[in-house]
Amino acid sequence: MPKMKTKSAAKKRFRVRPGGTVKRGQAFKRHILTKKTTKNKRQLRGSTAVHETDMGRMSQMLPGRGI
């Protein structure tokens, strides 16, 4: 059976941490920012981990990465 290919879109958007969790960027930070408070925009600045219910999909999109 051939190797599974990594999804290019997932490769650009996600990073696998050493512990096996997956790091992702925050959504809702691209446009229409005038309605959002300064506190809200500041909290959206950092990255966060992918939820455990989505980890099955992550392991399919990023095979062979220790997820």
From Swiss-Prot:
PANTHER family, sorted: 54S RIBOSOMAL PROTEIN BL35M (PTHR33343), LARGE RIBOSOMAL SUBUNIT PROTEIN BL35M (PTHR33343:SF1)
GO biological process: translation
Species name: Albidiferax ferrireducens (strain ATCC BAA-621 / DSM 15236 / T118) (Rhodoferax ferrireducens)
Statement: the UniProt record of this protein carries the keyword Ribonucleoprotein: yes
GO CC annotations, alphabetized: cytosolic large ribosomal subunit
Keyword flag Ribonucleoprotein: yes
One Pfam family matching this protein: Ribosomal_L35p
PROSITE patterns reported in the protein's UniProt record: RIBOSOMAL_L35
Protein name as annotated: Large ribosomal subunit protein bL35
Region (Disordered): 1-26, 38-67
The entry's keywords: Ribonucleoprotein, Ribosomal protein
Family: Belongs to the bacterial ribosomal protein bL35 family.
A GO term for molecular function: structural constituent of ribosome
Biased amino acid composition, Basic residues: 1-16
